[in-house]
Design a protein with these regions (language model features):
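A hydrophobic, multi-pass inner-membrane permease signature
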Residues: 1-202
Length: 202
């Protein structure tokens, strides 16, 4: 969805392209606030469902801007003109040319999105009630908060019990970041290329 939106906004023949881009940027500068967001999710019937964690993060305006900049800088207009002469339409050009040439930025967006969702617990905190739907990070937060309260309430500072609590805390944190450590090496080369998009000229 992000790449499709970025491709549409990169086309000069799109009517109202500047106004649409400004509308997208406006939502990034000024958010509606937490209460309207909560009411919207509730009225859409996504409260206490996993969709409340998935749908709000489907499109990120910053990612759209990054992808649009990448498309404008890596895919020249002459390439589309040559493809259109051969009878290639917008959607086919997107699938055959834009997607293959955008692999580095796609890898970066996937990594940013994965890290953002993996580290997020706030949406689950306000939208999810059932324990079987709660993500790992919410359990980790609840454990860390409860263990800190227990530490402060203990009058007798038992060194051994405090050491065990710290060990459990660190183990949970390590387990929570382990999937990202496993995932990152496979897309590291694309990540470096994507981050350097637009940084080197000449």
């Amino acid at each position: 969805v992000t790449l499709l939106t970025a491709f549409a906004l990169s086309r000069h023949e799109l009517i109202g392209r500047s106004a649409i881009s400004l509308f997208f940027a406006f939502t990034m500068w000024f958010s509606g606030g937490l209460i309207p967001f909560y009411l919207l999710v509730r009225d859409l019937g996504m409260y206490n469902t996993r969709w409340a964690l998935i749908v709000p993060g489907v499109v990120n305006v910053w990612n759209v801007i990054v992808c649009r900049t990448n498309i404008n800088s890596t895919i020249p207009e002459e390439m589309y003109e040559a493809a259109s002469i051969d009878g290639c339409g917008y959607f086919r050009f997107f699938l055959r040319m834009v997607v293959p040439l955008s692999k580095p930025i796609i890898a970066v967006i996937v990594l940013w999105t994965a890290i953002g969702h993996w580290n997020s617990y706030f949406n689950a905190l306000i939208f999810i009630l059932d324990n079987d739907k709660k993500p790992l990070q919410l359990y980790l937060r609840e454990y860390l908060v409860s263990s800190n309260v227990v530490d402060l309430s203990n009058v007798d500072f038992d060194t051994e019990s405090l050491g065990i609590q710290e060990l459990v805390k660190n183990s949970l944190i390590l387990l929570s970041v382990l999937p990202l450590w496993i995932f990152y090496p496979f897309i590291q080369k694309y990540f470096v290329k994507g981050v350097m998009v637009g940084a080197v000229k000449g």
